[in-house]
Swiss-Prot record:
Purpose: Involved in the biosynthesis of the O-methyl phosphoramidate (MeOPN) group found on the capsular polysaccharide (CPS) of C.jejuni. Catalyzes the ATP-dependent phosphorylation of cytidine diphosphoramidate (CDP-NH(2)) to form cytidine 3'-phosphate 5'-diphosphoramidate. Can also use other substrates such as the corresponding adenine and uridine diphosphoramidate derivatives or cytidine diphosphoramidate analogs, with lower efficiency.
Enzymatic class: transferase
The protein, known as: Cytidine diphosphoramidate kinase
NCBIfam families (UniProt xref): PRK05541.1
Amino acid sequence: MKNNPYIIWLTGLAGSGKTTIGQALYEKLKLKYKNLIYLDGDELREILGHYAYDRQGRIDMALKRAKFAKFLNDQGMMVIVTTISMFNEIYDYNRKQLKNYYEIYIECDMHELIQRDQKGLYTKALNKEIDNVVGVDIEFDKPEADLVINNSCRNNLEEKVELIIKKLAL
């Protein structure tokens, strides 16, 4: 690991597996690193306040997440963040402002996301019952991530976690 700990930013659409992979990564790394914290996007929204779910509201919320991660990282914490925040403005900000930033894109095809639809977001959005769903009526910017993990098949969680650990030399 570099002199400063990483900010590991897992991004992907709702239901792609960010939280599952992020939590598994946290559980594995906390055995080795005491200066580790896990920040879930949904939980941070509860803590930091509800912003609008439109594109600009999502960007504003993502910037708050990034600034909070930076605050913790500047104090020596390794930070794992799981968040949708799939906008070029966020990628650019993070690459410029966050030290030891490592971006992981959890990719999953839309058909599979609709099949999973854990929160009912995609079904409701496609039926025009709700709006402001990233990937349906809010376009997203696919990141040029340091690592892309295809999670269209929800298998091999341990292998995906080990791949991240290997890439970061943790």
